[in-house]
Amino acid sequence: MGTDHVASVDWAARAARQPLPSGLVIDGESRGASSTRPVVTPRDGGTIGQVPWASAQDADVAVAAARRAFDTGPWPRLHPRERGEVLQRFAEVVEAHRDELALLVSLEMGKPVRVAHEVELRALIRTLRFYGEVADKENGEITPTGEGELSLVTREPAGVVAAVVPWNFPLTLAGWKFAPALAAGCTVVLKTAEQSPLSMLRVAELALEAGLPRGVLNVVTGDGAEVGRRLGEHPDVDVLTFTGSTAVGRHFLRYSADSNLKRVYLELGGKSPNIVFPDAPDLEAAAATAAWAIFFNSGEMCTAGSRLILHRDIAEEVLERVVAAATAWVPGDPLDPSTRMGPLVDERSMSRVISQLEAGVDAGAEVLVGGRRIDDGREGPYLAPTVVSGLAPDNVLVREELFAPILSVVTVDDEDEAVRVAGDTPYGLAAAVWTSDLGRALRVSRRLRAGTVWVNCYEEGDLSVPFGGVKLSGFGRDKSRHALAEYSDLKTTWISYG
């Protein structure tokens, strides 16, 4: 591809002729469902097609296919190297269809097509390649024993995995689930989010082109209350992994308790603090990054830096720069390659966010910029980038995960107060610290209860490091070789031969 391939494509024209997936992918086949549902694009609120809408019965069929593929099929019995080779081919096929998949992501959930192409698809391709590489790198153990005895500790695939994924990164987060599960030798039933069914259905079709055996990766749509619940309660599901809200995560724990006690891994909400101290190495960079951390992906990120905690000595300077930076994040047409920020995912999200904003203002919050729906004649749920201050500790804009481009700013007097304010949340997904003092960086990082802490940066990382949270942000880890442990069982084999 050229130096700016994304800019060279007429994405709107391509969207007009883009075919949509026509079936659920179950047992290696594209299948219809008993009903369909319109796909509404947040780009302009228009209907772009129909998608088959799965029921609990369809989920049963998908689980049965995954169960057969695990119990009697070749996938768990392949040499791990061979599974890795299939995942590498899978990555190549996805790469060949990168434009198509980026367009589907942009259409279904409003992500700017450049971000879909350069971030979302890059992440999925790298995830497939990473787990293709490490599939045969996990070793067992031989532990010390007495004469005439041998003990073996091996990792075996856990079985059928149900993955329930969100709409905000419909391929990135799905890949973080199904790629390590497949590498470990499991079979998968993945339920798409209601708002973003298209891209993952197409990826499942491409998996078959890459040589994944039938029944190994099954993808269904459907309502969470019906299909998600059925997967959570299904006795033939061995592991359930979920990314989404804390409220829904609680349901999955109940479903497990009421069924077969399947293992459950949860990556849930966040209200991540971004702390800037006076000795930050570059206040301009800190301010620009603070804006990026909340306005990227329209703030629809579980790790969004939604709470900016500023030391009083530099609060005015940094806040002025953040407000200026916010004005540069202009929501636009997601199919325009120059757009940095698109709409919210749907009108329901817009209504919820506006209600939360109004409640926050009624409780004393001051809107410094934004705080309104963009009303310039365009269709679609476009929200202006928003910065608010003057927040009491119990203000809804400080306490709740908004999943929107809304930055809440709090001023503190010292390090202890910064840590206390940062920790005054039920969540513990991520945090950031800006300081030139290595001692302070390490000290504050240790004191913050979060799955990831960034120092002098935000949202940096790699597939080689794990991702997940603590407290109400969940448990279990995506990414890295550590994720393979979530989809495998440890077995001890003790042999007496003397």
Labelled PLM ranges:
Residues 46-49, 237, 275, 330, ...:
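Conserved C-terminal structural/oligomerization subdomain of aldehyde/semialdehyde dehydrogenase
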Residues 45-138:
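Glycine-rich loop-to-alpha-helix module at the N-terminal edge of alpha/beta enzyme cores
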